[in-house]
Amino acid sequence: MSLNFLPGRPNATPQTACQATWQNHTIFAYCSGNNLIILTNKFTRLQTIYTQSDCTAVDINSQNGFIALSFHNRVLIYKPIHQIMQNPKWTQCCQLFHDDTPVNCLRWSSDNELAIGSDFLSFWKIKDNFGVYQPILQWNQKQPKPVYNVIISQDSQLIVSIGKYDCNAKLWKRVSIVGEQAIFNLTMLPHPKPITAMRWKKEPDQVSKNNTASHALYTLCEDKVLRIWSCFEMEKNHTVQIWGEVPLSPTQKFCVIIDNWIIRQTLSVKDSEIFDISDSDIVILGSMTGEMEVLALNNLSQDPPKPMTKKTISHKKVKKATMLNDTRYLYLPEIQPYDNVKGKLSFLVHDLQGVIRHLLIDILQLINNKTEDLSAALEHKFTGHNKSVQKLVRSSDGEALLTTSRFSENGVWYPQKLNHGVSLRLQNTIQTESPIKFAVVHELGKQVICLLENGALQAWECPTNRKEDSEQKQSYLRVETRLKEEKKIHPIVMLNTPEPKHSHERHFTALIFSDGSIKAFEVSLTRGIFEVKSDSLDIDGDDIYKISIIDPVHQTFVSNRPLISLITKKGLTRTYKAIVNYNDRHVQWIKACEINTGIMNCTCIRGSSTGKLCIVNSTGKVMSLWDLNRGVLEYEETFHNPIEDIDWTSTEYGQSIVSIGFTGYALLYTQLRYDYTNNTPSYLPIEKIDITAHTAHNIGDSVWMKNGTFVVASGNQFYIKDKSLDLTDPFTYQSIGSRKILSNDILHLSSVLNGPLPVYHPQFLIQAIYANKLQLVKELLLRLFLALRKLDFESQDVSNLDSNLGMDPLKYFIAKDRDYPVESFPDPYPCFNKTVSLALTEQLTKTTLPYLTRHQQITLITVIEAVDEVTKNENIVDYNGVRFLLGVKLFLSHKNIQKSILMRDVSWALHSDNKEILLSSIDRHITSWNRAREYRIAYWIKEQDLVKKFEDIAKYEFSKDDKRDPSRCAIFYLALKKKQILLSLWKMAIGHPEQQKMVRFISNDFTVPRWRTAALKNAFVLLSKHRYMDAAVFFLLTDSLKDCVNVLCKQVHDMDLAIGVCRVYEGDNGPVLGELLTAQMLPETIKENDRWKASFIYWKLRKQEVAIKALLTAPIDLENNSSIVDKEVCVNRSFLVEDPALLYLYNHLRNRNLKYFIGSLNVEAKIECTLILRVTDILCRMGCNYLAVSLVKNWKFIERNSIPVQKLLKSPTKDRAYSAIGAMASEPISTARMRPSLFDKFGSPSASDIESPNPKLPNSLLDDFLQPPPNSTSSNSLAQSSSSAPRSILDEFVSPSYSQHKENLTPKAPNDSVGETDNSENRKDKLSKDILDDLSSQKPQKPKKSAITKNLLDDFV
């Protein structure tokens, strides 16, 4: 990270800036308003010291690092806290006061003595009394006019002072010291013109103490002659005389002197001898056009003195951009060596008009006459506001920035590239008659529209066609209008309302008032400001609690986007767009989005044009990030400090970055890929911008500009961070982790943390398995193994691993596993098998793959093991079973952070045709109820299996830990209605404190009212004692299942046990289970917006048509659920609500049976299409772009108005098919491999074909609905049809007698085998057609290899 400062506008006094060298480090200090700015460590370390009023002069003692600072009539002395420069900091040690006149100048000598100029010239010594510093006045003298400038020699023997416009310099010679008093003699040094500058020739501190016989004084006056005076002792007489002159040419405007000690320190001895300047001082005479003359002066340090000689060393030319060409005055602080950088000089230029520039000069280039060009690189630029910045307003494109203050000081700034990072350049100043309240910046900063505190609406022109360093920075007020003062309402936000096509001549601006009303204006610099018609915000009677402008973060101009976001007191959030109709002079406001966040009394809200929103809760310490496009919460975090500011930006790919501002620092967060498998957060802090080490002032405002530049305003200072990263930042280090990034910047890192995944990434493989692409995953794992093996053999770095593994992209788009082309690889690894699995796992334990963290690589090994296990069971487990086994494997590898398998995994098992096999694969792990709860067996295993597992668990719970406690297994035996076994166990529980009481009590008959009442009383007593499980047992003892499951659900908080007890006690689909699901589980599901759980609930309630709809629809929008839960309570607290796997299960179920299919017809095509696009966006956010393309390419939309569908819906036989589905246990669950798809039955292309079925083709599902009445149908024709056709899926839906009749007529094939089944399936695949082929709006054609496949959504989007 490169953090540059604009510490504040320097004050316009000659001694406002000072540069010195202390302990071989360059220190720079200057005055800005009432602040002292100190920069150290190569100008990277900043300290800001605040004073009572504006500062006038500052000087640094190069001997001990003390800093003297004057303001008004006082001088403050600051000492360094540490004597080492790693973390330099200064603190006040004493204060000086002489008289009431303002202090104009001050200078240190080496012996901690100080000369101060006001109306008096005074001389002070700062005495150290064991760490307590005491200022002692040693001499003072009233001056005829205020002292304008004063300098003191290093040995404190000579002081020179002048007044403003003086032609005579006063030289004060120290002649004696009596006690703590000093005596000075005066010598006048006449000049022909007013003196403009003067300085003493300096030596290193250790030399100056030993050699005090001779001093050289430089003076410059308006006659443009540099005079060198020599002050020396001769025969005990003090002598001062002119020792030489250096005239300046008419074009030369300034003079810079480099003392010989600086040359010796920065140049090697060899270079000094080569250029013959080892004993010379250098004088640089420069013009405002960048032309420089470099001279060497000799014999200035000789004792006894010799006549001065001078020679021209070189002539140089520097770029005008680094100098000033329009200023009248220049102040050049002393040149110093640049820290320990050999051959570099630190050169400062103060223009006395608000800017100090820091340049680096190569001294070898300066004295070398072989080249004319001199590179003077602009390292830093020190400017800013004079008073505190109130607000930062950026242009919509991020190219310009407006800063406002509490006064009339406002400025337009542009980013400026420096050698080390980015700074800001002041382009224009705007002086308004009243402080700016709101503003909008247009045309790359060339136009500013602002509303002032006094109600004036103004448009300013800010010219930019000037020279870069021009001091003509004023702006021009072009048009103005006054708003009528409203007493009841007031403007709360001002914004730009873009037209569909951008116009440079006019702009539309809107003012939103506190009641939601809006005033819109057309603003033209040439024609004026005109009010146009505007709608009010549709806020439905709600108050606007908080409102903010949405940050425009797109890389290009976008007009059709939300412009404002607002939130009510109860947390209802809305965003609005504006549509500008220029012809009608009308601005229309449309609600773009509305979500209920549930965050009441929020303190801050800020949105992004990419559809993100950040909200801070009422405490100011909880930040939540929302996706407005999907209406879900993506991230939430709680901080220790209150949040003050929020700002958004994005990469060119639309990946969001948000800054969360606090009082002294800002945290930068980037979005991450969605991870639905590991439940990792979707945002990550990647950098911390901390200014507390540089200033004690709080952050006032912050804003993002283009190209990842982040600007912070604090007081009158700016802190500018470019896009580069600080690799020592712990947040940055953690976010990069073990990844290798190509570019060290925040935008690139955000793209790496998002973007497409390599195809060997575990998340990609997991989502591919969910998308029914098991064969693709196997090939990818085999290719990964072969690629790593090849890299190992060829001794190549693993970073050369192809992220796509050389896979043909078309293979990702194959819809069904059975259509996947089998590719044979060379021996000894022709396909993925156990050998490959073990070898690949071993490789991954030794090799770190690119773009994968350690945790992700562990997950990849888990996926490999799961695929290996699935491969063994592939022929006996259907695909939902495969998905379930993968979920179990992932759960086992994440048990430390995951309590149980997910409801997604439960749904896979629930809709699998092989529940017994799935149970057997995990049965050995399920011993206790805790283990059973981990696998959520109460939700999905069959009733008879659950009864058996309850018996096993009851036995284990009784005997575990060798305590033989019947109370632990009581709930299970009573659910099994085996009270006698429980009684026997109590009789065996010798030593249990409650044995005798329980044996006597349980022995009673609880069908008798007396004992039933006694048991109920005991249950309530146990509830009052918080013995909830025992209370549930006593409720169940009295046959009060409802009270029992209520206790288990509400007090024990074990929904799994409640469901299990219901299913075992009253059988599947009993009334108590139905009430439990609807009264207890459903309301929470609606609040959590859990679609997996909602689908399960409706499946258990025998509402398949609603269960399939629940996969795509929010639970509150199903049936009459809006009356169960208030919509305001429903908050999408997680981005996981729209799992892409929901869509995969939906597609599977609508192919499963008729009731699911008819239920899917209730989902509108528009909703289905929208959901497809949203899931596609989610998959891309997950990094699974190939799978997103495959989903869009292969999805089939049902044409709801097609003839087959309409006749199906109108058929009376449909209702009989509905009624034939009884309890859930009787749901048709024959394996998909053995049963043709439901959609195979809709293969007739026309109505005539439907009414006249071809007897040679298999019997169609619709034949049973569309045939003539039963009395006109002969049994012979039925037998003939049945004998040649495969068994219809409707046999399981129609009446039992009809099914039995068909079974009798259909010949049975002897000795069925798996191989024959597979052959039968292959034959059926050739004949059968998917129902979606006929119900979709267009039949998809098999893509040719050379042609581009048409996207199915072309007809819908």
Swiss-Prot record:
Pfam families, per database record: Rav1p_C
GO BP of this protein: early endosome to late endosome transport; protein transport; regulation of protein-containing complex assembly; vacuolar acidification; vacuolar proton-transporting V-type ATPase complex assembly
Subcellular location: Endomembrane system
Keyword flag Nuclease: no
Predominant cellular place of this UniProt entry's protein: membrane
Xref: SUPFAM superfamilies: WD40 repeat-like (SSF50978)
WD repeat residue numbers: 98-134, 142-182, 190-239, 384-423, 431-470, 595-636, 638-679, 898-939
Further facts: Present with 149 molecules/cell in log phase SD medium.
Function: Component of the RAVE complex, which is required for stable assembly of the vacuolar ATPase complex V-ATPase under many conditions. Required for transport between the early endosome and the late endosome/prevacuolar compartment (PVC), suggesting that assembly of vacuolar ATPase at the early endosome is required for transport from the early endosome to the PVC.
Descriptive protein name: Regulator of V-ATPase in vacuolar membrane protein 1
Biological source species: Saccharomyces cerevisiae (strain ATCC 204508 / S288c)
Gene assigned in the entry: RAV1
